[in-house]
């Protein structure tokens, strides 16, 4: 149990699957921020995909269904069917890698990283937004609630809107993600209204419902109980010719290349925040390289949605 909400993600293997790369760059914001780099396990001079595909598959029902729906599976003693039902819903909703339906890798990864690394717990995923709540025409990819304590010991809450982009070039991924953030910002009143009207029905635990009510419905003459923030998952092509380097050197090359890339692009992310007057928001950015971003994001989700994974 987090600070009020339960985590939906099964994250115990996350640190084994996603290797974090330490660096010294930041966004220079006055608000809270994260700028974190990860890569998959390197094996035989390439990123090993099997583990992440299995992990996503095992989390698919937690991604697709609300807490209330998952509890219904439990009460019906039918939890074993939740994964297959979730996959069926996704296949009915669209093809693997179809953006906007919840079937694109970035849409699932931004949910996973905001829950697993930020501890901002899910209110709605992209699948839920597109299947359960289409009338609201949400442009977010996931919506989360973060409850934290600042350096002075004062608690604060943030409604975190997630977006993602996975494409060959990191700069292009940043540009695309900020285009999406601006769309979310332009529709923020509608997004917040949707959460306020529907979030309680998606919970089942009375304590969680009461916790959300205290945040989303302020008492008379009281100010807002939360701010809005943005979470980004960015994927790009690594750009290292693995045939030219021995296997034992490849991971060191990956780490060095990622640090070089973030040194180049962190100022650009900060610039995008500044020029779009977004500096009053917290930003949480998670970056993962691929061997071939376009092919890998399709291949991973195709295997997950087919159930063609290693268990």
Range-by-range predicted roles:
Residues 174-267:
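Acidic, metal/cofactor-coordinating or nucleic-acid-engaging core segments within structured domains
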Residues 46, 167-169, 238-242, 293:
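Short acidic, S/G/P-rich loop/turn micro-motifs used as interaction or catalytic elements
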Residues 88-111:
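A short, highly charged nucleic-acid-interacting micro-segment common to nuclease
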Residues 244-311:
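Extended, charged low-complexity segments
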Residues 123, 130-214:
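Glycine- and acidic-residue-rich phosphate-binding/metal-coordinating active-site segment common to enzymes
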Residues 161-163, 229-235, 284-289:
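Extended hydrophobic secondary-structure segments that form protein cores and membrane-embedded regions
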Residues 2-85:
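A structured, charge-rich N-terminal accessory region that forms the first stable segment of a protein
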Residues 105-137:
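Extended, Lys/Arg-enriched charged tracts that mediate electrostatic binding to polyanionic substrates
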